[in-house]
């Protein structure tokens, strides 16, 4: 990789030297023509001198009169009423056949243009970036194998090309040169055809299923009025979509495996926080907005460090974006300071019919200091479809703990509250009663055994233990109903050779399937 960069640098330097040599050649030619013009001037000078001497020879002393005495102070000058014949007033007699025009003496180069100085700066040519100007950062993705192998410049196309393909390998690069070098090295080692560069608009990737095609938003064509209305110079901004395509289990498993296998090489826009069962994404500046949106929908984000223009979160829900904008403009004095979004979320839950539960989020906004990314490690991914419920229970317990910790914070400002999302920030003043009621209402609506979209006895047991430590009480209608059924079944006069069918079912559901150990 370093040899390629050195060769490219040498190529640019040689091109600059070639331009310099061309400029020297043009200047040498121009100097040669100027010397010829000077020789022609020297040839004409004796003729002028002869004409001047002949005019002086015809002068007689009687024709010269003295200048009148000046009565006013000042420099003496010739009388404008007296005719004066001086050498400068004599017209030169030209004996050559070709007439010399004054313009010929003013243009010694005879129409040869002087080479202009090159305006290119060596620093700009070599580096390609002007100081003080920020250019949009474009990442490149190499899909090494599979039916859609190639080099992409869009994360969405890359995900569509690799999602659901077994054994596919892909990697992210910061420049097209690095991506091309890696792709060529792979194809050379595998003795396969060279991978093509596939821009965003030319990627022909069909939806994976008919259901995905139905849920994908169609492109709307702009209809312009042609009678008396002038067409605007630019297309109108896209309207806010009231719904987004639901995340599928395949999408979640793809992002889950991507986070587990990410080792931090080749991408400085994100890093992962790795635990025993799950890896969460931490997105930095210039991260792919589409990937941020998908990871947000999957509940796999821990922190976001957006740019000043908030381009990384432009695809998040509109109310969340508006809350972040209001925080930047109203809650901090220096609007140019970096901020962070710390997210605690559950993960989706699916059934045979489809998506059952969308993630719930508690988001904290604050002013960010220097970001020190943790080292991303490639972790082993052994999760199966049947393990997703257990993982959802663990993330649900962690979500409840984070939500209950808000009771210990006395200075909180609620930026936004929705049915499944709470956005808050720290405040210099004590929490007002309105914000306190909003937090309590959100806690009462979310903290229950139905947190994951279905009644989970393990969640109920965790809530009960947590609330008892705080000195409170918690009761679940479903769990109390199950206990009543168990008690009634124990007093039933049924057969004594075995438990009733309802007893075994209820006891199996009532046993917690996970521990209360916190998973960061």
Swiss-Prot record:
Keyword Cell inner membrane: no
Pfam families registered for this protein in UniProt: Cauli_VI
Gene Ontology biological process terms from the UniProt entry: regulation of translation
Biased composition (Basic and acidic residues): 40-51
Subcellular location(s) per record: Host cytoplasm
SUPFAM superfamilies in the cross-refs: L9 N-domain-like
Domain of life of the native organism: Viruses
Recorded GO CC terms: host cell cytoplasm
InterPro entries: Ribosomal_bL9/RNase_H1_N (IPR009027), RNase_H1_N (IPR011320), RNase_H1_N_sf (IPR037056)
Region of interest: Disordered: 32-51, 487-520
Sorted UniProt keywords: Host cytoplasm, Translation regulation
Range of residues in the leader sequence: none
Function of the molecule: Enhances the ribosomal termination-reinitiation event leading to the translation of major open reading frames on the polycistronic viral RNAs.
Other information: The inclusion bodies are the site of viral DNA synthesis, virion assembly and accumulation in the infected cell.
Protein name listed in UniProt: Transactivator/viroplasmin protein
Biological source species: Cauliflower mosaic virus (strain D4)
């Amino acid at each position: 990789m370093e040899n390629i960069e050195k060769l490219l640098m040498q190529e640019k330097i040689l091109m600059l030297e070639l331009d310099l040599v061309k400029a020297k050649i043009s200047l040498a030619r121009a100097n040669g023509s100027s010397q010829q013009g000077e020789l022609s001037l020297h040839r004409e000078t004796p003729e002028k001198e002869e004409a001047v001497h002949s005019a002086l020879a015809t002068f007689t002393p009687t024709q010269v009169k003295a200048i009148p005495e000046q009565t006013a102070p000042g420099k003496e000058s010739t009388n404008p009423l007296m005719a004066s014949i001086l050498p400068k007033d004599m017209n030169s007699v030209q004996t050559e056949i070709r007439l010399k025009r004054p313009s010929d003496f003013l243009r010694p180069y005879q129409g040869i243009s002087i080479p202009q100085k090159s305006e290119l700066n060596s620093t700009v040519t070599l580096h390609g970036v002007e100081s003080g100007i920020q250019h949009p950062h474009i990442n490149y993705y190499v899909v090494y194998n599979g039916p859609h192998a190639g080099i992409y410049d869009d994360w969405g196309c890359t995900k569509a090309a690799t999602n659901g393909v077994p054994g596919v390998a892909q990697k992210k690069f910061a420049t097209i040169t690095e991506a091309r070098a890696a792709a060529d090295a792979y194809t050379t080692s595998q003795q396969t055809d060279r991978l093509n560069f596939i821009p965003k608009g030319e990627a022909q990737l069909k939806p994976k299923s008919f259901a995905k095609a139905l849920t994908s938003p169609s492109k709307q064509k702009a209809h312009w009025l042609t009678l008396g209305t002038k067409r605007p110079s630019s297309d109108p901004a896209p309207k806010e979509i009231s719904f987004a395509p639901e995340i599928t289990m395949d999408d979640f498993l793809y992002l889950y495996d991507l986070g587990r296998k990410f080792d931090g090489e080749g991408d400085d826009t994100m890093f992962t926080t790795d635990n025993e069962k799950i890896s969460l994404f931490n997105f930095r500046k210039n991260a792919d907005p589409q990937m941020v949106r998908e990871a947000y929908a999957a509940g796999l984000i821990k922190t976001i460090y957006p740019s000043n223009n908030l381009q990384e979160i432009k695809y998040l829900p509109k109310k969340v974006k508006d809350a972040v904008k209001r925080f930047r403009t109203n809650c901090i004095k220096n609007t140019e300071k970096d901020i962070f979004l710390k997210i605690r979320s559950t993960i989706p839950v699916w059934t045979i019919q489809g998506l059952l539960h969308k993630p719930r989020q508690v988001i904290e906004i604050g002013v960010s200091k220097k970001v020190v990314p943790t080292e991303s490690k490639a972790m082993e991914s052994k999760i199966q479809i049947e393990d997703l419920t257990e993982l959802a229970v663990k993330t649900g317990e962690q979500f409840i703990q984070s939500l209950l910790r808000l009771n210990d914070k006395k200075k909180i400002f609620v930026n936004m509250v929705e049915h499944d999302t709470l956005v808050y920030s720290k405040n210099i003043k004590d929490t007002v009663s309105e914000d306190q009621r909003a937090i309590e209402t959100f806690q009462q609506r979310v903290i229950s055994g139905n947190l994951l979209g279905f009644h989970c006895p393990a969640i109920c047991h965790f809530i009960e233990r947590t609330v008892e430590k705080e000195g409170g009480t918690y009761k679940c209608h479903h769990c109390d109903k199950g206990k009543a059924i168990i008690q009634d079944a124990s007093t039933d006069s049924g057969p004594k050779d075995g438990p009733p069918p309802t007893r075994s079912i209820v006891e199996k559901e009532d046993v917690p399937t996970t521990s209360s150990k916190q998973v960061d």
